[in-house]
A protein has these predicted regions:
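Conserved alpha-helix/loop element of class I SAM-dependent methyltransferases that forms part
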Residues: 31-67, 78-81, 85
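Conserved SAM/SAH-binding beta-strand->alpha-helix loop
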Residues: 98
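C-terminal lobe and adjacent flexible extensions of AdoMet/dcAdoMet transferase-like proteins
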Residues: 251-391
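Short, glycine-/aromatic-enriched active-site segment of Class I SAM-dependent methyltransferases
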Residues: 215-235
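Short alpha-helix
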Residues: 237-252
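A short acidic, Gly/Pro-enriched loop at the edge of an enzyme's catalytic core
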Residues: 135-142, 153-178
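A short glycine-rich, Lys/Arg-flanked "PGG" loop and its adjoining helix->strand segment in the class I
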Residues: 193-208
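Conserved SAM-binding loop
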Residues: 105-106
Length: 391
């Protein structure tokens, strides 16, 4: 067997076996200490709290009433915290491929529901890099139609595709927020592009990902990547810190932010520092670019900034933008950074012409005010309010 194939299979096997064991007995080496609000923890059974393995806290980026997906939900601690954050009108879905961890979470599901007064958590069996395939459904099909020969294997592949299409584990555009806590680094390198594509697929337009994970300040050398113990311990599979952000960008996210970065490394191996970061990224910049004579002015403090579509905004300059970008820049995480300038006469979008978003250009004020705008007005009152003169 080629070395690369052997390493891939051994790393996957090591992850499964180590976390299956950790579902039965706590393993401190898998844990990067994280503190959560005590009132959220009080309803969660001790067995789950003792089997929690994470490195960050993405819960502050989840809102009441939202549908939230937890990738690699493990014993369910984060899901049970989120159940209280989203409340009775919200919904939490946990996905994990480790049956022992999934069993631990499901075993205490009703207990937590009784304690908080409602049931809004669902644990599903699947791979986080393949959120279309429901492994519980696949398992039931295999019980009735086991694979005995190559022909059966081909039939199985067709079955998988049918299940992905007809009964996806997580449908397209169905989730407001995707969270994960120290799990993405456990996914094989060759599956990571699909992993981020799946996160993007399941999010609603305007939704966000809030991901806590371990990153490295340097490339992890091959001999460390081949170590199953280090891989399953969230070390040798760690993303390089800049590549982690690039993965979100390549998947189509925008507004990508490192909202928390551990100052001191969690571990150092052969001089390479490994630490926890939490990244928030948004979905919603895709779509047609239409000209509505709108403009934005970047307030500063930087001399200029560039967005994820390559638009450049010099400080203080009135820049032309399409209708989509105009509204995007007024929402988080950009809100407060730009002044938005509406045209004096609105252009209905069904009458708007295409806007060329491939280049950045300044908007002539007459485009928003109109060439026939020659109004002269008197002072409308103190320009700085009632506290004193404006100069």
């Amino acid at each position: 067997m080629p070395e690369a194939t052997s390493q891939k299979s051994s790393s996957e096997s090591a992850v499964y076996q180590r976390y299956a064991s950790a579902a039965r007995q706590r393993e401190d080496a898998l844990c990067c200490p994280v503190e959560y609000a005590a009132d959220f923890l009080s309803v969660i059974p001790a067995e789950i709290l003792e089997r929690d393995y994470g490195c960050g806290d993405p819960t502050p980026f989840v809102l009441a009433g939202e549908t939230v997906l937890d990738l690699g939900s493990g014993g369910g601690k984060l899901c049970f915290i989120l159940a209280q954050v989203v409340g009775k009108k919200g919904r939490v879905i946990g996905v994990d491929c480790n049956r022992e961890m999934l069993g631990l979470a499901r075993r205490h599901q009703q207990t937590v529901a009784d304690r908080i007064g409602f049931s809004n958590v669902d644990f599903r069996y699947g791979l986080i890099q393949d959120l279309k395939l429901d492994l519980d459904l696949l398992g039931r099909e295999l019980e009735q139609h086991p694979v005995r020969d190559p022909a059966d294997w081909l039939t199985l592949r067709h079955l998988e595709e049918r299940l992905r299409h007809d009964q996806p584990l997580i449908p397209d555009d169905s989730v407001d927020c995707v969270v994960s806590n120290c799990v993405l680094n456990l996914v094989r390198q060759q599956d990571r592009r699909q992993l981020f594509a799946e996160i993007f697929r399941v999010l609603c337009r305007g939704g966000r990902a809030a991901i806590s994970d371990i990153v490295a300040d340097e490339d992890v050398p091959a001999h460390l990547e081949r170590d199953p113990e280090l891989w399953s311990g969230c070390i040798s599979g760690a993303f390089r810190e800049d590549k982690f952000l690039e993965a979100f960008e390549e998947a189509g996210f925008h507004g990508i932010q490192v909202v928390k970065r551990q100052r001191d490394p969690w571990r150092t191996v052969e001089g390479i520092e490994f630490r926890s970061v939490t990244v928030v990224a948004s979905k919603g910049k895709q779509g047609p670019c239409l000209e509505a004579n709108q403009a934005v002015i970047y307030r500063g403090p930087f001399k200029k900034v560039e967005d994820d579509d390559g638009h450049v905004y010099p400080r203080g300059a009135r820049m032309a933008v399409c209708d989509k970008t105009f509204h995007l820049l007024q929402r988080k995480p950009y809100s407060g950074l730009f002044d938005a300038i509406e045209p004096r006469e609105a252009i209905p979008l069904d009458e708007a012409l295409p806007f060329d978003c491939r280049r950045s250009k300044q908007r002539d004020p007459r485009e928003t005010k109109g060439t026939d705008y020659h109004v002269t007005t008197e002072s409308a009152g103190p320009c700085c309010g009632s506290d004193g003169p404006c100069c």
